[in-house]
């Protein structure tokens, strides 16, 4: 989400945006990466969420081919640059007009103009293990639901302190569209609230 803002800024300056793609990470980093507004505002470092969950900072290392950081314990790291002004169609190999399924499970329209990354280096551990999340699926939507739950909890607690006891962003709603709330009814007017 944030990378698009940085990519546009670099492109406006006519420069490529150096990036690292880190794969095979510990679960805390995947959880932290799911956080978005309004739970974490723009500019918030989601690696801080991961560090808090694991009770130690996420170690970073300097990339070998780009001037950008990478996650030290990643199994596989792809380093490259998002090229300014270079685009491809998302369905360039299928010509179907459709993309991979969206997070709720339906097929969306293919993006006609995606940025291109020029890969500069790939580094990996010996016998690297790649565990990945490709949605839609329960693992993916459960992770997506964590920041949704936190946002709902924060908003309701601010509006009606002590009313919300628990919240679950159900996987049937992709972790975003269906919330189940447990509330503490304190007065007759709370019925049906």
Language model regions located:
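Charged, compositionally biased interaction regions
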Residues: 25-193
